[in-house]
Amino acid sequence: MIIVISPAKSQNFEPIKTDYQFTQPIFKQQIIKLINTLKHYEVEEIEKLMKISPKLAEEVFAKHNSFNPNKYDNSNAKAAIFTFSGDVYKGLEADTLDNKTIEYAQNHLLMLSGLYGLVRPLDLIQAYRLEMGTNIKIDGKILHKYWQDKITTQLNEYFSQQQNKILINLASNEYSQAIDKKSLAAKWLDIDFKENKAGAYKTIGIHAKKARGLMTRYILENRIENVSDIKKFNVAGYQFNPDFSDENLLCFTR
């Protein structure tokens, strides 16, 4: 069983004290091609491309131009699971997971990324900003199409080493479309979270994002390897709701 989640635009590069064996990014050649493409963009072009403020565009420009795709170590990079710090990662709280759970996560959790493609928890990453939905073409393909074959092939290699071939999709649509479902050698299982608002159940972005992190943590801490145990998730008031679920979707409501 493998979980996939989205990355986060917010990243924390404060150093941490750990004794983990960090790993290198999977798709180094592709990263070089992408970062070299991004380095050709001036501040004003980044502002338009990413639809961000001039100040933020300057920060992104600086990040990409200081990016060294041939060097990943503690001087310029940090393990991905401790770096991303958006809503999903607030739910995950990776810095409070014990060493054995982080080591388990290394083989069961992957983060999708516009720049890195697939990221394992202990892969070292440098500061960047490139959302999967960014309107940029690489080799004549939009970003998620550029990554699709590469990511899916790598996932299939990982699933060949997994006993239970199930992909738990806790990523957003923007990122999960970078996986080719038809070519995936595993069952695809979506998970959704809904809130009861005035008698109607709705998916509310900020709550759903944090819940994805909570679910990721639950699966990792409990070493869950089957769907029936996922249904037992009962955290932050969420419970499995069969009325909104089917064989390809588990929905949790509160």
Swiss-Prot record:
Cellular component aspect of the GO annotation: cytosol
GO term, biological process aspect, one: response to hydroperoxide
Source domain of life is Bacteria
> Matching Pfam families, A to Z?
H2O2_YaaD
Assigned protein family: Belongs to the UPF0246 family.
Protein known as: UPF0246 protein FTN_1542
Per the UniProt entry, what species is this protein from, by scientific name? Answer: Francisella tularensis subsp. novicida (strain U112)
